[in-house]
Amino acid sequence: MNLGVVMPVELGMAGDPATVLEFARTAEALGFDEISAVEHAVVIANTGSEYPYSPTGKSHLPDDCPLPDPLELLSFVAGATSRLGLATGVLVAPNHNPVVLAKRLATLDRLSGGRTRICLGVGWMREEIEACGGDFTRRGRTTDEAIAVMRALWAGGADGVDFAGEFHSFHGACSFPKPMRESGVPLYIGGHSAAAARRAGRLGDGFQPLGLGGDDLAAAVAVMRTAASDAGRDPSGVALVLGATLPRMDASKAEWAAALGADRILLSASRRATTLDAVLDEMAACAERMHLA
């Protein structure tokens, strides 16, 4: 079971280079497999959009919480580490031009030695997507096409590649360098909806269900696997990433995740960990319980 840790942006220190490096280097030294960074290009004050992972419909983060660009943050971390995986959770796909994003992801993956894993989502904040020039009502279709665009560019050779889609088209496009893996940067799909589960089954290298547990989680995994089968894919080939908190992670949690077919768990600090030292203590205790180092 691979274990990752989520950047504790709740502390309000994710824009501080010393804090970022201490967190990342500690995670690597303790034996964690990856760190994961979140994205919001902008946060709209007093947004009318409902945050789907809170019973109040409001995000637990203040509007002025520092949220660095995740790819820039991971590039910074890549140069200061040697083994640590570099993940997003999630990158809001409709905020990005996929031609440019393909180059950015390939560059990060190449220069980090193939350590990149990207979790994409369609986003929940209408105003953010619109501020980035996207269409909230078409965000599912644009995400599907973005995945196709990036994979086409990564697979294209010296003669270039052609693409004709609903939102993007090009002829003879060459995009180098390529990702380290011939299959490209792994693209996981994150979300809580049936649409996200189906997208993961149809198109994803993995599925990262968010905010789900119990019967809802089992149902989402089943939807993903059915969609994979319907698309002619092997459902077992779609990786599954689950979540937990650092203090609750133990051997029984790993067994539970493995029974669902997961090979990776992303761990967050508890609400009690309100300082960096407290987060690092939870990480160290978890690493000792799981015999990581």
Model-identified regions with their sequence ranges:
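Active-site-adjacent structural elements that line small-molecule/cofactor binding pockets in enzymes
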Residues: M1-A293
